[in-house]
Structure formats: structure tokens, C-alpha cells
């Protein structure tokens, strides 16, 4: 089997929606169940069908899963390949779905206060490297929510006192395609509040193997820094924290004892 190595870039992973989708496929059912459990646990006046927004929706795997549950789902992503892939998979739901190109820090919606639920998982929020952009994004999410609506954000925290390099690996297969995804994170640069990230996808299909690498930086957050950020958004209240096991019964404190955190934020009522 021949192997071709692709040049590294900042977008390679996202320019290949199928392979990106395969990497995260195993999370979809767990995340869907968790969102329903979170609404039951923390929501009010949701009814059976909700209007949901997913910032940075990627390949649309969660949009599809939630649409299959009868919800109206909207999402955006800044990568046009991901948007096109998501639109194609959601065609069968017609008017109950909407996907468009946009960015986390300055996205536009048709009507403020119209969403019941917003979710942004897999640490996507850390792509915003500047504090002002993180604040702007949270404010836009708050404005998009109705009073009492929920916003769930999942991200990795950084403990600057215990900050080694990290490595994760995923393997998945679909329709004769095998994807091995490996992700490395370097120790955080504390002053800059960034960590260098590298993902290598080894893709095997039709007797050939190729490698695609993606390089980027994440913004880092300690628990204290995340609390400070949330304190700037007066319209959102932190009601609970969970982790990437997606168990509604397993709550976490917002501290540096655990790296994976899911924030459950509620839009305050006036």
C-alpha cells in the first residue's frame, strides 16, 4: 500500500469533512443524550421540540442527530467545505434546518432571543485567541437565547502548575475508509495564553494511504481565567459543570482538578 504525505496547513483537517466526521462520530449519541438530559435537569418551559443553534457546527453530525429527534436546528461554521457537507446531510429535513458560513466572534442570526438551546462542544471555543473575541462570542450567544434558555460549552482547562505535553488518538472505519487521527498539544505558553496543537490524520482508502496534518493554536484557560471571562457576561448564569463523560449525574466543580469541563449556562430572566 503506497503512502503519500501531504503538506501541513492550518485548515487540512477541516477541509476534509468526511474524515473529520468519522473522528467524532462516536461522540454523537452521547452528546445528543446529554443535551436532552441537560434540558430536563436545568431547563424550563422547553416543550418537546426546541430551536437549537450550534456555533462552529463542523460536519453537521449533531445537527442531524438533533433534527432526527424532531428539533429545529441551525448551525454555522467558517469552513465552507464543512458547511457544504452539513447542508447536504440535512436536506432531508427541509425547513427545520439552516446552515451558513459565519464565525464565532461576530455571527449573525435572524432574530435575537429566539433559541432555546445553544451548544458548542469539543473545545471549539478555544479557537478564539483574544479575550475580546471570546467575550463577543459569549455575548452573541446570550443575545441569541430566549430568557431561561441554555448554553452548553465544552472545553479543556489548563493547569499551569501541571502542564505537560499531551497526546490523543482516535481510530474509525466507514465504508472501506479507515481514519487514524492523532493530536498533540504542547505545554502552554503561560504569558501568551496559547498552546500549539497538531493533528495528523492517516487516511487509508482504495489501496492508498495519505497523511494530512493541521497546525493551529488554542487559547488556554485555567479555572480562574474561565471564571473571569464568564463574569464579564452579566446575562448568563453558570448553573452547573460536567465533563466529557457526558453524564448528567456526574457534576464537576469549576476548578483545576479536572481538565475536561462542560459549562451549563442559563440566560437570566429580567
Write out the residue ranges for each language-model feature.
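Conserved class I S-adenosyl-L-methionine
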Residues: 1-50
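Class I SAM-dependent methyltransferase "Motif I" SAM/SAH-binding loop
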Residues: 56-60
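Class I SAM-dependent methyltransferase SAM/SAH-binding core
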Residues: 61-107
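A short acidic, Gly/Pro-enriched loop at the edge of an enzyme's catalytic core
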Residues: 109-117
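A short glycine-rich, Lys/Arg-flanked "PGG" loop and its adjoining helix->strand segment in the class I
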Residues: 135-147
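Conserved beta-strand signature within the Rossmann-like core of class I S-adenosyl-L-methionine
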Residues: 148-155
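SAM-dependent methyltransferase
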Residues: 155-228
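C-terminal lobe and adjacent flexible extensions of AdoMet/dcAdoMet transferase-like proteins
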Residues: 219-270
